[in-house]
A protein has these predicted regions:
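Short, well-ordered alpha-helices that flank and scaffold nucleotide-derived cofactor binding pockets
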Residues: 22-25, 29, 109, 113, ...
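An amphipathic, basic-hydrophobic alpha-helix
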Residues: 66-95, 113
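Structural motif
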Residues: 7-9, 97, 119, 142
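A short, glycine/small-residue-rich beta-strand->loop->alpha-helix junction that serves as a flexible
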Residues: 8-21
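An aromatic- and histidine-rich active-site surface loop
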Residues: 41-45, 84, 93-114
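Active-site-proximal region of nucleotide-activated glycan assembly enzymes
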Residues: 2, 33, 41, 112-175
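Conserved nucleotide-sugar phosphate-binding/catalytic loop shared by glycosyltransferases and other
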Residues: 3-11, 29-76, 160-166
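Catalytic machinery of carbohydrate-active enzymes
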Residues: 2-4, 29-33, 79-85, 94, ...
Length: 177
């Protein structure tokens, strides 16, 4: 039996990594083949106690402080989208979960061009820049809070409130004390 492959594309901060890792653990227990992408910052948060392929994405936020930094960051993002395109072309998952953050952006854009289904998850009260840009292209938007700001009304049909994705260690904290 061929395992379905799930790719989780996440930003590099703890607010992105920990929900992504919890999701990876959940799908691994359900016997899916799970891969996770993040940037160099995210690697320091991850312990690989799962059968999980972790791929480092070299990307950048779009820096608008001066024209020189803007041009450099723009080209880094374009190169990252191209690299993500070829990665997905040869490692095609069944679905992608975009967890927000600038390092999830290139994977989700490449997925759109390759017609790979992807959903996004937003765990803040205000939608992040990467997720906001991806709204027209994703299949669904999973949110922690129904009161999420920044989603235009014409995308409300895509929104599904699921709450916060919480690590198992936190859920089981009182059970083990």
């Amino acid at each position: 039996m061929i395992k379905k492959k799930i790719l989780i594309a996440t930003g590099g901060t703890g607010g992105h990594i920990f929900p992504a890792y919890s999701l990876a653990k959940f799908f691994s227990k359900k016997k899916y083949k799970v891969e996770l992408t993040t940037d160099r910052r995210g690697l320091k948060f991850l312990k690989n106690d799962l059968d999980l392929n972790i791929i480092k994405i070299n990307s950048s936020p779009l820096i608008k402080k001066n024209i020189f930094k803007f041009i450099i960051s723009f080209f880094i993002i374009i190169i990252s989208i191209i690299n993500s395109f070829f990665f997905l072309l040869f490692n095609r998952p069944s679905i992608i979960f975009g967890m927000g953050g600038y390092s999830s952006f290139p994977i989700c854009v490449a997925a759109f061009f390759l017609r790979i289904k992807f959903v996004i998850y937003e765990n803040n009260l205000i939608i992040g820049k990467a997720n906001k840009f991806l709204l027209p292209f994703c299949q669904k938007i999973f949110v922690s809070y129904k009161e999420l700001e920044g989603i235009p009304k014409n995308y409300n049909y895509k929104v599904i409130e699921i709450g916060n994705i919480v690590r198992e260690e936190i859920i089981n904290f009182n059970k083990n004390s």
